[in-house]
């Protein structure tokens, strides 16, 4: 078993309801007490240009991303992560609203199809199409 002070920063002993004891070892790579990197706060102008670029294309090539990052005074990584997050947000929005205007278009012809369907199943249609044989 690795030593707790070399490879692990914290060892926690947990006692379960049935009385058994378990040891939790948290690796140094998961140092939960280290300070987090401050969150990037985008200006309104940056957000406007990022949204505009996203609406043009949800994906950017490396060179386009680098140019956009430079023009906005951001790092390439900040733009990349913003686009990843924005695509995720868009997928969430799309999944919440499954009825879109383009999915309603086929319904425009529904009335004509329904009338033909009704006409087909009338007694006259049965007789004229020899559907019912005597």
Curated annotation (Swiss-Prot):
Gene3D superfamilies, per the entry: Homeodomain-like
Signal peptide (residue range): none
SMART domains membership: HOX (SM00389)
Pfam families in UniProt: Homeodomain
Main localization of the protein described in the UniProt heading: nucleus
GO terms, molecular function: DNA-binding transcription factor activity, RNA polymerase II-specific; RNA polymerase II cis-regulatory region sequence-specific DNA binding
Coiled-coil portions: none
UniProt DNA-binding region: 35-94
A Gene Ontology cellular-component term: nucleus
Top-level division of the source organism's lineage: Eukaryota
InterPro entries: HD, HD_metazoa, Homeobox_CS, Homeobox_TF, Homeodomain-like_sf, HTH_motif
GO biological process, one term: central nervous system development
Keywords: Developmental protein, DNA-binding, Homeobox, Nucleus
Subcellular location per the Swiss-Prot or TrEMBL entry: Nucleus
PANTHER family documented for this protein: HOMEO BOX HB9 LIKE A-RELATED, HOMEOBOX PROTEIN CEH-62
Record protein name field: Homeobox protein ceh-5
UniProt source species: Caenorhabditis elegans
Gene: ceh-5
